A protein has these predicted regions:
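Non-catalytic, conserved peripheral segments adjacent to functional cores
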Residues: 1-103, 123-125, 132-133
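A short beta-strand-loop-alpha-helix capping motif that often carries His-Thr
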Residues: 116, 128-129
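Conserved metal-binding segment of the jelly-roll/cupin
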Residues: 102-123
């Protein structure tokens, strides 16, 4: 049985963890990485990606340092696994809070602007996807 799409809040306001259904068979797997109607129904903001990037990492242990650009991001993994880490860099009560999660193809994270984003690959040949969002 395939799991349902679930969205989880975190200690960082606006940082959301998504459990994504992955449908597999002997050929491989398929997932809806983003489906607007389903995501909105579960509380994600309505957004329009302005750019989509893929970071391919050949070796396990590759680290990408903390980035905190002035836009929201939607991150996921197309293949492999990562250890993701986020830190709230915004002024206010949540400044300095951190969240860590292992991500594979069945997980995504919505990252609000002002929250630092970083990861380390846990497997060779990991492909990390990043949609930059203008709201």
């Amino acid at each position: 049985m395939t799991k349902e799409l679930e969205v989880h809040t975190t200690e960082i306001p606006g940082l959301l963890i998504l459990d994504l259904p992955v449908h597999g068979d002997n050929r491989g797997w398929f997932k809806e990485n983003w489906q607007r109607e389903k995501m909105l129904a579960r509380g994600l903001p309505d957004f329009s990606p302005i750019q989509n990037n893929i970071s391919f990492n050949a070796a396990r242990g590759t680290t990408r340092g903390i980035h905190a650009e002035p836009w929201d991001k939607y991150v996921s993994v197309a293949s492999g696994r990562i250890f993701g880490a986020w830190v709230d860099l915004r002024k206010g009560d949540s400044f300095g809070r951190t969240v860590t999660v292992e991500l594979g193809p069945d997980t995504a994270v919505y990252v609000p602007r002002g929250v630092g984003n970083s990861f380390q690959t846990l497997e060779d040949n990991t492909a990390y996807t990043l949609s930059l969002i203008h709201i």
